[in-house]
Regions:
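Beta-rich carbohydrate-recognition and catalytic domains
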Residues: 3-47
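Predominantly extracellular/luminal cell-surface or secreted proteins
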Residues: 3-5, 68, 115-117, 137-139
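A short, structural micro-pattern
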Residues: 11-14, 59, 130, 170
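Short, well-ordered beta-strand micro-motif
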Residues: 19-21, 102, 138, 164
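Disordered, acidic Ser/Thr/Pro-rich linker "stalks" and the adjacent N-terminal cap
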Residues: 41-106, 117-129, 150-153
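Exposed beta-strand and adjacent loop surfaces of beta-rich binding modules
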Residues: 62, 109-111, 131-135
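Trp- and acidic/polar-enriched beta-sheet ligand-binding modules for extracellular glycan
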Residues: 93-96, 118-174
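Extracellular and analogous surface-interaction loops
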Residues: 99-110, 165-170
């Protein structure tokens, strides 16, 4: 399926992949529930495609956010509003800008996804020299931070980077 975004351009789209099967009458159907959440990949035939849901839930929705800066009206709270059409932008885009999300309690984090938006981009074709570099830290108390993900040397374009952690992480702040 294609998901319409149409924020930068009227035909701007994203690809959506949903579990699909045939019912007893041979009619094809898809399960789009929790369509942007992690799904289990079946290793064989599945009797009920609803069983592909991992059970992992979005922990950041509507949670408090702080940032080093913001550009114009692109407020940090946009990061946790779960809208594909809103986003946060730091004022400069230079190293040292940061964003912090409070999960408002100790939570078990199993995966992290960052979705970048091409704010103020003027490039129309794929640029091989543009890529996303970042680090993700976590903290239980908001004072002592440990590195979770290090993509500071990344040389790939990852506008929707999904990182599944090797082990679940108990944390309060990211």
């Amino acid at each position: 399926a294609t998901c319409m975004l149409s924020l930068k351009y009227k035909f701007e789209r994203r690809i959506g992949l949903y579990p699909t099967a045939f019912d007893k009458d041979g009619v094809m159907y898809s399960n789009t529930a929790f369509g942007d959440y992690p799904l289990l990949t079946p290793k064989g035939k599945v009797d009920d495609i609803a069983n592909t849901f991992s059970g992992w839930m979005l922990l950041s929705y509507g949670k408090p956010v702080m940032a080093s800066s913001m550009d114009s009206t692109l407020v940090p709270e946009n990061v946790t509003d779960e809208s594909m059409r809103t986003f946060w932008s730091a004022r400069s885009g230079e190293p040292g800008e940061w964003l912090q999300i409070s999960l408002e309690g100790l939570k078990e984090v199993r995966a992290i996804q960052l979705n970048y938006y091409e704010h103020r981009a003027v490039q129309h074709n794929k640029a091989m020299d543009l890529y996303h570099q970042y680090r993700i830290y976590h903290s239980i108390d908001g004072q002592n931070w440990e590195l979770v993900v290090d993509k500071s040397d990344n040389d790939k374009d990852v506008p929707h980077d999904y990182i599944e952690l090797r082990e679940p992480l108990k944390t309060r702040y990211l």
